[in-house]
Curated annotation (Swiss-Prot):
Protein name per its UniProtKB record: UPF0053 protein in cps region
Xref: SUPFAM superfamilies: CBS-domain pair (SSF54631), FAD-binding/transporter-associated domain-like (SSF56176)
InterPro entries attached to this UniProt entry: CBS_dom, CBS_dom_sf, FAD-bd_PCMH-like_sf, FAD-bd_PCMH_sub2, Ion_transp-like_CBS, Transptr-assoc_dom
Organism expressing this protein natively: Klebsiella pneumoniae
Keyword annotations: CBS domain, Cell membrane, Membrane, Repeat, Transmembrane, Transmembrane helix
Transmembrane spans: 4-24
Localization: Cell membrane
Amino acid sequence: MILCLSFLLMIGFSLIAEGFSFIIPKGYLYAAIGFSVMIEALNQLAQFNRRRFLSANMTLRQRTTEAVMNLLSGQKEKAELDADTASLVADQDQHPLFNPQERLMIERVLNLNQRSVSSIMTSRHDIERINLSAPEEEIRSLVEKNQHTRLVVTGGKDNEDLLGVVHVIDLLQQSLRQEPLDLQALVRQPLVFPEGLPLLSALEQFRQARTHFAFVVDEFGSVEGIVTLSDVMETIAGNLPNEVEEIDARHDIQHHQDGSWTVNGHMPLEDLVQYVPLPLDDKREYHTVAGLLMEYLQHVPQWGRPLRLTVIPCARCRST
């Protein structure tokens, strides 16, 4: 644009000069045009190098996310405005375009495909389960004290094989019909997700299969944990407390008056960075605070050992 205006000005100036019988050597005109072209080329090269430097360590998705979040942040770029234009936009600058909660949810949606199901799953060690051959009294006792809508059914010699899932409502209906509780007849097969499946793909599979429950398996086919549709939705909306007022370990974080934080070891790092600024390595093989500590220490952390994060007591070699 600037180059075109320069050409027009030079051509117009030469025509006006010729109209007043002033003779301007063409060599000066050509030199001015060549100089303008060279300056514009250097300007474009400088802008290209600057953009390449700023985006060298960022993927296209990350750059797009950052651009959208900058747009939604409500922080307008500084620009020189005349008095009339400034008076028109003065009132708009007093209020942000989006409130913080809206910006946070939009950012989570944009990052949805960069998180895998293993980062939000419930570990198999924390799964409420029941043996396929359990007596009816044990089933009733577990249903009475359990507040979940589904129970994972296990079998095998060591009761470690996850066979499927039973809906508590099915057990209730079976009981209302005065029938003996039969887990074998009620077991349903959930979806099976590889541990590296992106959340966006998991959400689509949940929608197509019309089920809200899935096993997460590793490359060897071993079940590492479970994930539900509610888990995926919590990555967008934040923690959704249940009726029994249980504190989900993945959202168990407390801010103290002295500025310190108490964080559950099961909390995903992607959720932690919403509260505590923390650089994350995209190539890391861990997803939780406990994984971060074990990667840093190369052993099970000890209670109260001073680090950048303070670890609370461990149970059975697991950071809690």
